[in-house]
Curated annotation (Swiss-Prot):
Annotated gene: rplJ
Subunit and partners: Part of the ribosomal stalk of the 50S ribosomal subunit. The N-terminus interacts with L11 and the large rRNA to form the base of the stalk. The C-terminus forms an elongated spine to which L12 dimers bind in a sequential fashion forming a multimeric L10(L12)X complex.
GO CC annotation: cytosolic large ribosomal subunit
GO molecular function terms attached to this record: large ribosomal subunit rRNA binding; structural constituent of ribosome
InterPro entries from the UniProt entry: Ribosomal_uL10 (IPR001790), Ribosomal_uL10-like_sf (IPR043141), Ribosomal_uL10_bac (IPR022973), Ribosomal_uL10_bac_type (IPR047865), Ribosomal_uL10_CS_bac (IPR002363)
Organism: Staphylococcus aureus (strain NCTC 8325 / PS 47)
One Pfam family this sequence matches: Ribosomal_L10
NCBIfam families on file: PRK00099.1-1
Keyword annotations from UniProtKB, A to Z: Ribonucleoprotein, Ribosomal protein, RNA-binding, rRNA-binding
Name of the protein described by the UniProt record: Large ribosomal subunit protein uL10
Biological process, per Gene Ontology: translation
Length: 166
């Protein structure tokens, strides 16, 4: 009997560590998905560097309490799977949101970003954001635009002076 309790405590510690170390977590209800659809979802999440596991709600509830995350209890009903990302804050939300658009059976329940519980709508909003690399490239193009425009202006002035000299 105590071996089972120890195993459960170890599982709670493991889940708490995953929740603490992840930059984003998405909680979903996977009822109604076929095995093939779940396999497809898992492979998409794996490609994005996201871990996807099914846990008992009681274990997640205790782990969230241990990790200092409050407000998850109301979302931990029915079959629950958790997708966590420890590197890219939008990866889990992006893959889950995209998959949920194509598969109505996948229901986004909630999420956790940087220790704060977010709603399903907020998860979908985060999922529509560009990735970190996309945001960096947008920032770089915005920073390069004034320099590029200045270079074009200098080039145009130079060409205009050449035409006037002739």
């Amino acid at each position: 009997m105590s071996a089972i309790i120890e195993a459960k405590k170890q599982l709670v510690d493991e889940i708490a560590e995953v929740l603490s170390n992840s930059v984003s977590t998405v909680i979903v209800d996977y009822r109604g998905l076929t095995v093939a659809e779940v396999t497809d979802l898992r492979s998409q999440l794996r490609e994005a560097g996201v871990e996807y596991k099914v846990y008992k709600n009681t274990m997640v509830r205790r782990a969230a309490e241990k990790a200092g995350i409050e407000g998850l209890d109301e979302f931990l009903t029915g079959p629950t799977a958790i997708a966590t990302s420890s590197e890219d804050a939008v990866a889990a939300a992006k893959v889950i949101s995209g998959f949920a658009k194509d598969h109505e059976a996948l229901e986004i329940k909630s999420g956790v970003m940087e220790g704060n519980v977010i709603t399903a709508e907020e998860v979908k909003t985060v999922g529509s954001l560009p990735s970190h690399d996309g945001l960096v490239s947008m920032l770089l193009s915005v920073l390069q635009a004034p320099v590029r425009n200045f270079a074009y202006a200098v080039k145009a002035i130079g060409e205009q002076k050449e035409e006037n000299a002739e």
